[in-house]
Swiss-Prot record:
Name of the protein in question: Hexose transporter HXT8
Note: Present with 623 molecules/cell in log phase SD medium.
Main function: Probable glucose transporter.
Glycosylation sites: 92, 102, 429
Annotated NCBIfam families: SP
Amino acid sequence: MTDRKTNLPEEPIFEEAEDDGCPSIENSSHLSVPTVEENKDFSEYNGEEAEEVVVPEKPASAYATVSIMCLCMAFGGFMSGWDTGTISGFVNQTDFLRRFGNYSHSKNTYYLSNVRTGLIVSIFNVGSAIGCLFLSKLGDIYGRCMGLIIVIVVYMVGIVIQIASIDKWYQYFIGRIIAGIGAGSISVLAPMLISETAPKHIRGTLLACWQLMVTFAIFLGYCTNYGTKTYSNSVQWRVPLGLCFAWAIIMIGGMTFVPESPRFLVQVGKIEQAKASFAKSNKLSVDDPAVVAEIDLLVAGVEAEEAMGTASWKELFSRKTKVFQRLTMTVMINSLQQLTGDNYFFYYGTTIFKSVGMNDSFETSIVLGIVNFASCFFSLYSVDKLGRRRCLLLGAATMTACMVIYASVGVTRLYPNGKSEPSSKGAGNCTIVFTCFYIFCFSCTWGPVCYVIISETFPLRVRSKCMSVATAANLLWGFLIGFFTPFITSAINFYYGYVFMGCLAFSYFYVFFFVPETKGLTLEEVDEMWMDGVLPWKSESWVPASRRDGDYDNEKLQHDEKPFYKRMF
């Protein structure tokens, strides 16, 4: 490895949170507006004085090996997707209702109350949020791969408890919490490992494979529910739960072939292994100059971080490194992903389509699962072709239109003679069609892109902590939507769609003003862009310092005198 001196700034480049606990976010539409000195310090800190690392791009077919490895990591999304696809059917199956529900003497049938339904469906997300915040740090201690294997075992323990439940709903409830803890940790560690391993020009596509696996699992979950619904015993729900062991074992087996993150290996001083990992991912020889230069940059960055001491949770509120602004943006994006209303359909799809008069709502759920899964293949192309911002903006606009039609038809046309009378078949079919189109738009845009954004936004020093917080925000909103949806739909029915419509309209404006474009940049270049103070709506024109020519004017990207409405249209 070539000798390299790391020039550190005399003062730490991060700043602890102010005493009042809340840093100012004035002019927060800027990624930042740093001084010349701050930019200089940051460049030194990241080793940017070195020559540009040139990793030659190859055709997609040349990356078959790294693509398969990333698919093994992305298979972690199967855990969460399988739960989403199966739980929506469980709460409508006769044996499940008999064991864990209440008996209605007047109707001579078993049922789940709104409270119990909400808790059983949504508590998985609470466990996932706990796993994000507390177990995902195993990836910093034992490595991303070993950390993943440990949390998969935790997930399996939760599944055992659920299968062993006889007639106590709270035992099943506890099992879902523990399984959620494992799945939540996986949802941080797996995308992190993909982002740190994948070549930059196909990183977005490989990260989108996470959502592909989620949607594939949802579809298979729907199919499994349909296949077991004719049984009258616990086969209805225990067989789908038992299949979780197969998914866990497949992922553990896959992880034995996946190389460790080169960034983590550099962090623990295993330089030669880091070279081998980076070379394998980029189809280069270990001695290739691009490999040596990239690892040298990582070493310089890690040495700078070590000189500043151990990263603390307080550092998440740092303004000089712009971590607080990045964290705020990713928390908002992850929250808005849930507020698009996707899990309203995925958690309660079977129940929703019963209400619109479908003879077999399980069959309708399978149709939704097919649309959801097939749509994700478009995202593998669009996320790196169109970019992150355009995908989110296009998705927000189209989903808003779909939700307006869905809610309006449900409110005005579904029950022309009142709720006590049969629903309109034509209106019911219309709601299903626009639900399918909504899911298509979601799966092509917001579904995968949010995982891409949170995986490539943060510096290595605080990446694990920040991704944990951002993912936990997503899961907590998932819990709130899952828990309160039965109560809300009982009170306002299809007016609920207008709530999601408002959130989608807001998300369009938020993305435009606060989310930068990171397509085609290395993780270190993403850091540099944030420190350069580029306006998000001008970020597509930003060029890293190592590739700028004499005509490049970075200041033009930091200011915009146009009124906000002229910036958008």
